[in-house]
Design a protein with these regions (language model features):
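Catalytic nucleophile loop
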Residues: 2-21
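C-terminal and late-domain segments of enzyme folds
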Residues: 22-109
Length: 109
């Protein structure tokens, strides 16, 4: 209800929790964190796609297109990888990437 009259700004993991679930298998591969879990965890479900932030960041060596190309094979949902100069605006169900940097999309529908 609130999203109809408010703006959600998700930064870093705050953008990841907006999707249908946390896409743990992919996240564990590209972020290199072993969360000691294999089952999915529900996210907020505000959008029907996934976001992987920090594309090409010096702090996350596997958040690169070549790693994500492999890791994304576990889902058929749309996934965006965004660098720190990129964002996704969603208005009336329409997505628009706003970027002065680099971003990629997989399984675009």
């Amino acid at each position: 209800e609130l999203l109809a009259t408010r703006v959600w700004v998700g930064v870093s993991a705050g953008s990841m929790v907006t999707g249908p679930d946390l896409l743990l298998r992919t996240s564990q591969i590209v972020y290199g964190e072993d969360l000691n879990r294999s089952e999915e965890m529900q996210a907020l479900g505000l959008v029907d796609f996934y976001v992987l932030p920090h594309l090409n960041s010096q702090f996350f060596e596997k958040v690169r297109k070549e790693y994500i190309d492999e890791a994304v094979k576990v889902t058929d949902k749309t996934l965006y990888a965004l660098d720190d100069q990129s964002a996704i605006a969603v208005l009336d169900g329409k997505r628009e990437v706003v970027s002065e940097g680099v971003w990629h999309v997989w399984n675009e529908k």
